[in-house]
Swiss-Prot record:
It comes from Leuconostoc citreum (strain KM20). Signal peptide: none annotated. NCBIfam families: PRK05313.1. This is UPF0210 protein LCK_00974. InterPro entries: UPF0210 (IPR007841).
Amino acid sequence: METSQITETINMVSEEHLDIRTVTMGISLLDTVAGTPQETAKNIYHKITTYAKNLVAVAQQIEREFGIPITNKRISVTPIALIAGKATPDDMLYYAHALDDAAKAVGVDFIGGYSALVQKGFANGDLALIKSMPRALTETDLVMSSVNIGSSKAGINLDAVKLMGETIKAITDKSDTANAKLVVFANAVEDNPFMAGAFHGVTEADVVINVGVSGPGVVKRALEKVKGEPIQIVAETVKKTAFKITRVGQMVGALAAERLGVEFGIVDLSLAPTPARGDSVAEVLEEIGLEMVGTHGTTAALMLLNDAVKKGGVMASQRVGGLSGAFIPVSEDAGMIDAVEAGILSLAKLEAMTSVCSVGLDMIAVPGDTEATTISAMIADEAAIGVQNNKTTAVRILPTNGTKVGDMVDYGGLLGTAPVMPVVPKSSADFINRGGHIPAPIHSFKN
């Protein structure tokens, strides 16, 4: 390598917040099913602790060798509803606690996969899992949960949309922060390394390593060098920068998989912000030319950013997957928080932005008295964008008891701080209460 390249890499880490956001081990639990929930839970704990016992140590060793921070070490597992069978909501708690205990035993930050896939309908295990969520997410510390309620092939399960609005409200009654551990998807992917939506799909190998990279600060610094240039130069600069960022993820992921003796899965190309200044997707958009994120032109700038990240990253990794785009979580992005507080960034604008990026209405605080049907309607709107446009969309909404619009809610750590945002005061109840199933779009019929 040339001296300039070495210096550039050092600066990306030390000054521009480049990190490996997560090394996530995906583990299949399909072979853990036993005669009783208690036996299955015991098998779940044993398999996770067997395969993941060295995950944290290996990640830390790679950090020391290469000087590249690995912010999170995580686990994803088979959607638990798929192995639940005839379990009751109370039975599901054995599985939730087994996941939590295993995650703590091996020292990871989070474990994802307390999940259900209900885009076409409910099986018993799906309903049992969803009904158990208020207890499961408040009685555990590290368990992350997701529910897929729609897909471009199946349409949208409006009964599930309604149930998830009610479930989110029920969780709020027990905890103001537990909903940060739950995401509702359309077109969920099977190899996502990011939380809270990670689960290990049934088409995956038994155990794999997936990596999520992050570098909004690196992209921002690169764009500072092309101020005033035509927009195609901006796109080209982002592509080249994304290539460099992704090569780091490819190297770390392949090395971690080799040392752990498991398969290497994918690199997720997502630009994932943190609450730290200089590590913000909003600041990247503003560097492209917006006075503040949320103003007119934001959606176009985000489309360019998202597309250029994918184009640059695809060439840098042998396998790209996950969500791969730009994340716009309000509470986890200092620039987004500023824009909401200034009254520039609204829920309506955020919804528009989700049509061109990963992944959806994410980490958004709303007043605690927001109706369950209103939350369901927000989920339905996001699902519609994903289903119609054949992309992943999601909602991670945080109703917070005792808050009003403008209050700040602190979720701690990487989850950050969110200003409470207003929702439209008119009701969507009659629409949501219809229930049933929104058919798949006409372009879903491809055979």
